[in-house]
Amino acid sequence: MDVDGILGNRDSKLGKSSIPRRRQWVKRRETWLVILGVVLHAVYMLSIFDIYFKTPIVHGMDLVSPRFSPPAKRLVLLVADGLRADKFFEPDLEANFRAPFLRNVIKNQGRWGVSHARPPTESRPGHVAIIAGFYEDPSAVTKGWKANPVEFDSVFNRSRHTISYGSPDIVPIFCGALPHSTWATYPHEFEDFATDASFLDEWSFDQFQSLLNRSNEDPKLKRLLEQDNLVVFLHLLGCDSNGHAHRPFSSIYLNNVKVVDHIAERVYNLLENYYKDNRTSYIFTADHGMSDKGSHGDGHPSNTDTPLVVWGAGVKHPRPVTAKDHSDHVLRFIDQHLHDAPTPKEWDLDGIERVDVNQADIAPLMSTLLGLPCPVNSVGNLPLGYVDMKEEEEVEAVLANTKQILNQFLRKSQIKQSHSLFFKPFKPLASYFSMLNQIEELLSARDYKAAMQLSENLRSLALKGLHYFQTYDLLVLMATITLGYIGWMVFLVLHVLQAYTLLPGDIFRKEEAVHEKSNTGKAQLCGCLFMAVVSVLLFLEHSPPLYHAYFAMTIFLWTQILNEYKFIKALWRYLCGRKSNYVIKLLALGVVSVIILELLVHSFTERKLYTWCFLIVGAIASIYLYKSIPWRSGIPVFVCLTCWFLSLFTLMPAEIPDNNKLVNASGVMVIVIGLTGKWLDLNAGVNRFWFGICNHEKRKPRFPMLFQLQALFVGLSSVMVFLSTSHRTEKQELHTIHQLMNWFIAGFSMILPLFSENGLLSRLNSIFLGFAPPFLLLSIGYEAVFYGALGLVLIAWILFENSLLYVHKVNKSSASGKNLGEHAFLENDTRYLQLSDMRIPLTFMVLFNVAFFGTGNFASIASFEISSVYRFITVFSPFLMAALLIFKLFIPFLLVICAFSAITKLLEVPRIGCYFLVILCSDVMTIHFFFLVKNTGSWMEIGNSISHFGIMSAQVVFVLLLFALTNIYTKDIEIRSGSRDSRKVM
């Protein structure tokens, strides 16, 4: 009887003399494939930093000095860290406004609006946008967030002197290496979340007031303060700290709004009385807002909308709103919020003109008020709605802003052109010089309106040109990496087809057609020549070394694929010769596989997909079994119920709440499952649907009390959870004896499965019991129940496969009396892979992912509950705590891989062949995550996108290591084959 392989029926067999050579060839090639896979995924993992996280900052531009008289001699920048726009503008419950002084400024002295921040809405990127005029440098993700990772220009750099007081996390970024600055910060210890942090704001003001008072007795300091181009920066951290600790609806946070308003009033009065020249400009704003939960970082309006109030020298006075002010610009701010958003009625400011800006627009505004060159890296647009200047001066200010952005564009263009052999310029700015000349001519002709319009158009084109060169190499790199991944997957498929499947006789008739590369020299030569040409081009373009690696890996893979030209050609002819229903079946398998893998991709952000998955799979699998085997066996019902039980866990919160009663109950549940498994192992073997997985021999076990010992350890771990939690609740220190017992129980219980019987069910039952104690001791809530539910589903998977195996053998034996296994086996009692075997790696992928997402997600890991490691360690030790957390995450993975290994033995399929299919599935997901990497958004969003891609890329190593680890437990599992009545060792 022919045996159906992935791509056909067996027509002939290899000679006995060729089997050793084939084994050696397969072994060498697989070793080489694993090494290649590790290197390839490591190299390609780094590609995202060249594609998505390249710094936009360039150096070497000339400053653009403004051609107008500065309206102000000095400028005061007040930044209320973490102040939400709505909490600043809205009244309190008694209809009194929290910022009376600044509201008076809005109505009588200056201009106001909402400053729109771009995610990540954090303190450092927010201040960089305000003071330097550009948004978060994406390359900072590789260098750390707190410290300033790259050199950049700022308004402070261009000032004659800068005075700054505030947080040690912010002030040193801008003033730490600035020689013409006077600054001070309070100690980190002052940032105590248990207190009202508004005193930090008072500290900053007191330092500045003390400086002014000292100047009356210090002539040198007095002269310094009398200079023009002076910048005063007060960083007011109180709202941020109080928002984190007490939430933005708390009385402490709302009172802090009054504190910063009072500080703004005192700073204004202090300086007006000190200078008495009306030459001081004032800007009050915030770096980001604060969510209702007391956090920030993402693009929610509560985080991106911040107040902006500007008054003093060079600033327009308030203007009533007119009908034309509400025209729809159909434009969006940097946070994707529309222009002309209606002002809430409760703010009572809808009658006064509102001028919203992007956060980076504040930097050119400050430069213009002081008559300074804009920071050379700024991408902000000067908001003319704030500056009070003559029409000619307004055009000059916008032109200076335009030239500064244009200089960045020209510098990037110059750098790229000097390194490119086939340079593609940004065509819309090919005639930028004539546009500048035209603006100058319009200025000379005093046609200021036309000059303004042309300047703004040129500025807009320059910003688009910056984006063009920022993403200049993106398409080539993404295409190269994508082709590399596709080449790797094609190469894997070819290897699996050659090594683990039965193919038609015309492909296998001549052994050398498969194993010997008689005409591969041409392909190798072409690949080497092509790589040499590409390397020379990359070298001449001064490309980074990693660019060479990206291209080399991709070219190498496709060269190897071309080496298999004869095999691919024969395979194509074979497929073309098959019936259409077979091709449809093959295509259907591919489509279903991709759909399942795409659902897994989306499950990384939506855990509830697993609920629907297991509800549907449980029903379909049980119906399928119900039609194939008698319902009295109980297996269809068991499969359905266990899948539905597991589906509940992805509906539960990712942040696991404390519930130690559940942990204790889970210990009982694990013992009951283990006891049931033990009974079935001893008594269910006579049932034909359990045949092969139970311990059939009635011989005395090597360690007759092993099960009782394991059950005892599970019970002890539940008791220790109760005792440890009781001590913590009573605020008592964990006893050393308890700590030692927990370590002993967790460690010793994992060794015991090695001494269990080597029947499939008995060994897996022992592994389940062996890893339960450490998992229970590291659990704080429902994840302990999940452990039992996952174990039940894994048993259901094994029973499902065993039932299918039985039905398949019955059907085949009724069709033919021949020995089904004859000629269909590779070696070591493993058969060739069949088309239907693709369900094994797909099921593994689903269970492997649910082992992680069943109890949380990436965000919940980042904010794990410290009490989960309290039973092992009470003294803060980040490395040991992280190790315990990672080990806890690994335990469900280990269970899944043990079940996977057992199934490959049960079905007599090659485990390494299935491993390559798992990697193939992983790489389909990896390519998707490659295109989902983000360099904008909150740090959590950026970090999660990198984590998703990185984890899938690392799976080639991760799964292999877990295979090696679990092989210690599964290598001697024995399966009894009904057809041969023999035992096979894994």
What are these regions (language model features)?
Residues 12-21, 30-48, 71-77, 84-230, ...:
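Active-site-proximal alpha/beta segments of enzymes that process anionic O-linked groups
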Residues 284-341, 347, 351:
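Histidine-centered active-site microenvironments of extracellular/periplasmic hydrolases
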